[in-house]
Curated annotation (Swiss-Prot):
Signal peptide: none
Location within or outside the cell: Cell inner membrane
Recorded catalytic activity of this chain's protein: di-trans,octa-cis-undecaprenyl diphosphate + H2O = di-trans,octa-cis-undecaprenyl phosphate + phosphate + H(+)
Protein's UniProt name: Undecaprenyl-diphosphatase
Annotated keywords: Antibiotic resistance, Cell inner membrane, Cell membrane, Cell shape, Cell wall biogenesis/degradation, Hydrolase, Membrane, Peptidoglycan synthesis, Transmembrane, Transmembrane helix
Extra remark: Bacitracin is thought to be involved in the inhibition of peptidoglycan synthesis by sequestering undecaprenyl diphosphate, thereby reducing the pool of lipid carrier available.
Family the entry assigns: Belongs to the UppP family.
């Protein structure tokens, strides 16, 4: 398959799945298997196009970030708490990620692990949706520190490919009584430091390939994938918050279970 077409397809997969509770990393791993791509060749590409999804969050919520930034300059309590909560949620996965990244990549990056994680995550969403009590709408700067730390600890589960970073953080938030819209937006905002950190770490680990031009794919493919990921992720963010505020997360749970089961069957028959 043409590399530009491959870049477009993977950009669509990344943009569609990054902020939905279905695991973008898991879907990229399965897409690589399904279409027969060279996983090593496209590994760096899959990391870099996540920056397109990050940019989508910044564009969608730039007014929020501007207001928080101005509030920080004025030392406003709500803006200080916003930053405190974001850092408190980011730090657990940053520490654990640095400590365990190489082991997780080696031991848990297989398609079968992704499938089982999709199924387990789907069941967890159904259980949490059934039993979690919805809190009152509130902003991230109004959440107590313990809830922010809890969301950060939940994010650590997403180091297993197929669990889903957004799924883990949103479900962790719901389990602690945070209402759906705030849970989703907290997950979006938390993606920025988390994904920037992960991408920076990958780029540093692969700096020789970057400088030597041996990344496996060219800058044109990366540019196309980045742009497609950005556009698709922006559309998903705008639709997702409104949808889950009304309908909840059960459809994503059933999708995860079905996708994991079908993929397991396909892997077994290859």
């Amino acid at each position: 398959m043409d590399t530009i077409v491959t870049a477009i397809l993977l950009g669509i997969v990344e943009g569609l799945t990054e902020f939905l509770p279905v695991s973008s990393t898991g879907h990229l791993i399965l897409a690589t298997e399904l279409f027969g791509y060279d996983a090593h060749q496209w590994a760096m590409f899959n990391v870099v196009i996540q920056l397109g999804a990050i940019l989508a969050v910044v564009v969608q919520y730039w007014r929020t970030f501007w207001a928080v930034g101005m509030g920080l300059l004025r030392l406003e309590p709500i803006s200080l708490r916003f930053l405190r909560n974001l850092l408190a949620a980011f730090i657990p996965s940053a520490i654990l990620g640095l400590a365990l990244k190489k082991y997780i990549d080696v031991l848990l990056g297989s398609p079968s692990v992704v499938c089982w994680a999709l199924i387990a995550g789907g069941i967890a969403i159904l259980v949490i949706e059934k039993h979690a009590k919805q809190g009152e709408p509130s902003g991230i700067g109004q959440l107590p520190l313990r809830q922010a730390i809890g969301v950060g600890l939940a994010q650590c589960l997403a180091m297993v490919p197929g669990v889903s970073r957004s799924g883990a953080t949103i479900m962790g938030a719901l389990a602690m009584g945070i209402e759906r819209r705030t849970a989703a937006e907290f997950s979006f905002f938390l993606a920025i430091p988390t994904m920037l950190g992960a991408t920076t770490l990958e780029l540093l680990d692969n700096r020789d390939a970057l400088l030597g031009g041996t990344m496996g794919v060219g800058w044109s493919e990366i540019g196309v994938g980045f742009a497609v990921s950005f556009v698709v992720a922006l559309a998903v963010i705008r639709l997702f918050v409104a949808y889950v505020s009304r309908a909840g997360f059960k459809p994503f749970a059933w999708y995860r279970i079905a996708a994991g089961a079908v993929a397991l069957g396909w892997l077994a028959m290859r």
